[in-house]
C-alpha cells in the first residue's frame, strides 16, 4: 500500500510541475517581428514615407536606425468627429535621411507594445542617385522597361516571372550591372541574363556577391542591352525584392594589402573598374575582366568600431575588426585590422 501511495504522490508532483511549466510558457510575451518595410531605400538628404509589415507590432510608435543621421516620426491621422486629437497611424512613418549620411545598408527596428523588433535593412543611396520604381508590365523583351545608365531600379520578381529592362550604352563605356537582393535580406536568389538588340544572349551571372549577381558590359560601338532579371528557381512575390544598379561609376573589387595596423597611415593599391585616375598598368584580371588600379593613402582609426552597415553574412564575419573604405561614388570595402606589421 505504501508503494502505491508513493507512486500516486510522485505522479501528482510531476503533473503539478508540468502544469506550472505550461503556465510559465503561456506567460511569455510575443516577439515583435519586423518583416518588411516599403520602400526600403532613400537617397541622402531626402524624406520618404514608408510602411512597416510584420507581426506583434501593436502600437508601433518609433523606428530606430543604426545611423543617427536617419530619423523617423509616425504619420499622424487628422482629428475628426470621433477622435478630436490627431492620432498615430501605427504602420506608417516619415523617414528623413541627413545629407551627410554615407551611402550604405543600415539596420532599422520598430518600437512597439512588445518592445524592440527584429532588424530589417534600409538602404541609403547617394544624394544624386537616380531612383526609379519598376512600373507597368515588363515581363517580356518587347515590353522591357527603359532605364538610363547611372540609375537604380527598385522592384520585385513575380512567381514564375522575369523582369525585363533595357538601356543604351555608348561605345567604349564600361557599364557595371549589379543586383542587390541577399544583401538587403531578400528571398531572391537572383540571376542576370544580358541580350543584345537582336535577342542574342551576351552573358549571364549569378552568385558574385554571395547570391547576388554582378557583371560588366563594354562594347566598341553604341549598343542597346536587354536585361532579364529572375530567381534561379523562378520563385517570386513581395519578399523577392531587389535593387538593380546600372552604372559607369567607380567600383572597388579589392584593396591590397587587405589589412593594416590600427592607427597606421599607409599607401594601399585599390583595384577595380572606372577608378578615378586608374590605369591598367598592373595587368590584373578578374574572371577575364581587366582591372584598373590606383595608389591611395589611407588612415586607419586607432580603435575598431562596429560596421554601421547591415551585415547579412555569416555570424563569424561580424566580429572581424576593420575599417570601411570607399572612393567617391564607389561601393564600400573592408580593410581589416592587422595584429602585427604588414609586409608587402
Predicted regions and their residues:
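Bacterial N-terminal signal peptides
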Residues: 11-23
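Extracellular and select intracellular beta-sandwich modules with Ser/Thr-enriched
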Residues: 104, 116-120, 238-240, 328-333
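Predominantly extracellular/luminal regions of secreted and cell-surface proteins
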Residues: 120-149, 328-344
Amino acid at each position: 500500500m505504501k508503494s502505491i501511495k508513493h507512486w500516486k504522490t510522485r505522479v501528482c508532483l510531476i503533473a503539478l510541475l508540468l502544469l506550472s511549466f505550461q503556465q510559465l510558457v503561456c506567460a511569455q510575451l510575443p516577439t515583435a517581428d519586423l518583416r518588411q518595410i516599403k520602400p526600403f531605400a532613400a537617397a541622402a538628404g531626402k524624406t520618404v514615407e514608408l510602411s512597416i509589415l510584420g507581426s506583434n507590432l501593436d502600437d508601433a510608435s518609433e523606428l530606430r536606425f543604426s545611423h543617427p543621421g536617419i530619423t523617423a516620426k509616425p504619420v499622424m491621422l487628422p482629428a475628426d468627429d470621433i477622435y478630436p486629437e490627431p492620432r498615430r497611424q501605427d504602420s506608417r512613418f516619415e523617414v528623413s535621411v541627413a545629407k551627410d549620411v554615407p551611402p550604405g545598408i543600415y539596420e532599422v527596428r520598430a518600437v512597439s507594445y512588445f518592445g524592440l523588433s527584429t532588424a530589417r535593412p534600409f538602404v541609403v543611396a547617394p544624394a544624386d542617385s537616380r531612383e526609379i520604381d519598376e512600373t507597368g508590365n515588363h515581363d517580356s523583351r518587347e515590353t522591357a522597361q527603359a532605364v538610363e545608365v547611372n540609375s537604380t531600379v527598385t522592384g520585385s520578381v513575380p512567381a514564375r516571372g522575369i523582369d525585363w529592362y533595357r538601356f543604351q550604352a555608348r561605345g567604349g563605356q564600361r557599364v557595371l550591372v549589379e543586383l542587390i537582393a541577399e544583401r538587403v535580406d531578400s528571398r531572391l536568389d537572383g540571376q542576370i541574363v544580358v541580350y543584345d538588340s537582336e535577342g542574342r544572349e551576351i552573358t549571364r551571372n549569378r552568385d558574385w556577391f554571395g547570391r547576388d549577381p554582378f557583371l560588366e558590359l563594354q562594347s566598341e560601338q553604341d549598343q542597346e542591352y536587354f536585361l532579364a532579371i529572375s530567381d534561379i528557381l523562378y520563385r517570386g512575390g513581395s519578399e523577392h525584392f531587389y535593387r538593380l544598379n546600372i552604372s559607369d561609376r567607380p567600383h572597388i573589387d579589392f584593396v591590397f594589402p587587405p589589412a593594416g595596423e590600427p592607427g597606421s597611415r599607409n599607401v594601399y593599391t585599390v583595384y577595380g573598374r572606372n577608378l578615378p585616375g586608374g590605369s591598367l598598368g598592373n595587368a590584373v584580371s578578374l574572371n577575364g575582366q581587366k582591372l584598373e588600379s590606383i595608389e591611395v593613402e589611407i588612415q586607419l582609426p586607432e580603435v575598431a568600431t562596429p560596421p554601421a552597415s547591415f551585415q547579412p553574412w555569416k555570424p563569424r564575419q561580424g566580429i572581424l575588426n576593420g575599417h570601411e573604405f570607399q572612393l567617391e561614388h564607389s561601393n564600400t570595402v573592408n580593410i581589416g585590422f592587422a595584429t602585427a606589421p604588414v609586409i608587402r
